[in-house]
Amino acid sequence: MRALVKFLGVTLLALLVAAYIGVGLSRISFNVDILRLLPTHLKQVEGLSLFLKNFALPDELIVTIDAAEPEQAKAAADAIAIALQGRPDLVKMAVAEAPWDNNPANLSPFLTFVLLNQPPEKIREIAKQLAPDQAAYTLQETLEELNSSVSPIKVAMLTYDPFRIFSSLMDSALSGLSGTSEFSSKDGTFRVVYVQATAPFPDYQKTATWIKDIKALCNEAISGSGVELGFTGEPAFVAEISTDMQGDMMTSAPITLALISLIFWICYGRFLPLLGLLLMLQLIFLLTLGTAGLALNELTIAGVGFASVMIGLSVDYGYFIYQSSLTHSGTTRSLQWNSLQSIVWTAGTTAAAFFALNFSSLPGLSQLGNMVGIGVCIGALVMLGLYAPLVLKFRKPLAAPKTSRLDAVVTSDRFARVGMWITLGMVVFLLGSLVFKGLPDSDFSAATFRPRKSESHAALSKLYNRFRDDRGFLSLIVSGKNESEVWERLNRAEDALQAAKSNGTARHFLSPLPLWPELTHQKANLAEIKTLSLQSPRLKSSLLDNGFTEEAFALASAVFAQTETWGNHPLPIWPTDQASSWILRRLARHDEGNYLALGIVEPSPGCESALVASIQGEGVHLVSWGTLGDQLKQTLPREILHVSLALLAGILLILLVALRSIRAVLLFTITTSLVLLCLAGAMSLLGMQWGFFNLAAVLLLLGTGTDYSILILLAFKRSGDATQAQKQFASVIFLCCTSSMAGFATLGLASNMGLAALGQTCALGLLIDGMISLFILPHACQWFLKKI
């Protein structure tokens, strides 16, 4: 009966655990927004978040077409647009040319909107140009300029605007539409098709499937034409990065498990204990991932890296228990009790290190810390509660204890002696490198967040190279609770930008102020333009008398008609036609409670920081990925230092309680400092750079690599013999160090460059930490703790 109850209890527990894991896994999604990794209080992060949320166009894919001849590129663009428009189940709109290219009159609602937003005095100036005594003079000026101008843009504009109603706006509202095209390069051999999805994407899997379908349709449409296609834009980035993140998580854990299996087999050559260890690690991984799904809902780029790190750390407790079981002759409970102290102290400091990342203002690191910290705690419990009983059951009755194959090597005097000299040589060499080469360089640019290989970024770079390259420009983002608040802030920003242009910190800027409605302006200008529209017969007759055709009056006539249409429209007016929507989609947002305007500023070289400081204010952001990198370079090292010092203080307090020796704590501090200095020297020697991700390696090393020092110090406290302490934990430190290095080294293969840098830095740091702790610290203990 007791056996049946026990069986039912175990079965019920297994079902509950499976349900818990299943529910958690079903809730996981990926967030590829790199700004989710960064401090939200930074103005650059806040401004770029507004930009990505409102102007990144998550449903718009950009298809680039590169051909040898302009005609070939045009034909391919048209063929792709037609093919995609034939699939309304996938595509809402495929645009291969500007909506006003074939008929400039399509611009009339937008041009009317721009006129309505001008200061009333400007509209009165235009009215004077059209007065009976000035109209003919204005037309003669236009004819002279048409005959002498070498600018095709100006000629085209004056041909449709002989009364110069809109030409005066070329330097402001329309300057962003002149000189360049967002559909074709100047030579016509590079073109772009903008593709909008039928509906928003619910998740990254649907995005990836949609991208795959669009690629197939595009390739079929231009089959055999010899043109080269590229795909970029927000959907392409989301699909690419999310797929890479999923692949990283699904491949890093198995590779880590394979490396751990190899290490275990080389050391012990036992199949059943290895199988049990792998099952425990998979259970720990699933429990941690399920917990993350319930608690976090979505994983960032940093969170994806937790799997290999957590497995590499949790296996340490399994190694320790198995190594202890080889010479254990008591019960399961006594094995658990004997292992408890070392595991609690090492797991406690490791978990504390990762949980301490919550004191940082970096959400990405906080998520990584929480996931690994939870995993380490779960790992310690699973190894003590489940693996310890298993390893004793796997041991054959009456068989002689079987030690590790490496015990004879790693516990030998020769191994300790050679290891000490090699480690001393390494320390001297790395410290010398640090002295002569200096500290490693730093790189906090957006490039460190990107995938190693990215088709979408390659397509975007080609687009920048063939069109206007505005990557050095700053985005002006102005937000407010309503139109009036945004308009007031835009005015202040424009005054500040004019001052910046005068003092040389800004070269040029495109302000969205002429595109932003102001109620009193629109009301006054509607009345003024209505008055002008009543003079249409006179204006048209004057135009014909001066040698222009009726077609030259079509645009002005359409504007006058649009003014009549908007006569009784509630103010402020926003146009809703296709051409206006196309232009404003990247310049303005006016949803209820979400009002934003976007402009562009070209800074003078080297003046970016000063310009940002002079313009930025409440509701006004001047941002770019470059200025974000500069801000991170200033704030992150200081923040990491503060968190590291707080974490180190916590670890020292724990050690003071455990060791009850100020000298031992001081020795631990010296050892940790030496490890970090050697790591800096190694990075400088190898040309590695500090960045957002691998700065966090300092925190991770404080929680992972310090375990090796703690084990030696605890063993020395118990025995008082440094040689015995070294031999007791030589195998354990070797196994723990190699397995943790395997976890981080696997992370070094990640598709994301920043995450890979974190893995490489931590693996290098663990190697240095393990060698110093195993080969130098015991001698330091013998000398420092006995003689001082």
PLM features: what roles do these ranges have?
Residues L278, H328-S360, D721-S751, G770:
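Pore- and gate-forming transmembrane helices of large, multi-pass membrane proteins
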Residues I21-G22, A75-R191, G504-S581:
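Alpha-helical transmembrane helix bundles of large polytopic membrane transport and channel proteins
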Residues M1-V32, A388-P389, K393-S445, A458:
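Signature of alpha-helical transmembrane segments and their immediate interfacial
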Residues V23-A68, S172-E182, F320, A416-M420, ...:
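Solvent-exposed, non-transmembrane loop/terminal regulatory segments of multi-pass membrane proteins
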Residues N147-I266, R270, A561-L652:
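Extracytoplasmic
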Residues L294, M310-L326, L340, V344-F359, ...:
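Transmembrane alpha-helices and their membrane-interface boundaries in multi-pass membrane transporters
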Residues M420-L543:
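Juxtamembrane segments of multi-pass membrane proteins
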Residues P273-F320, A664-I712, A745, Q782:
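Hydrophobic transmembrane alpha-helices and their membrane-interface caps
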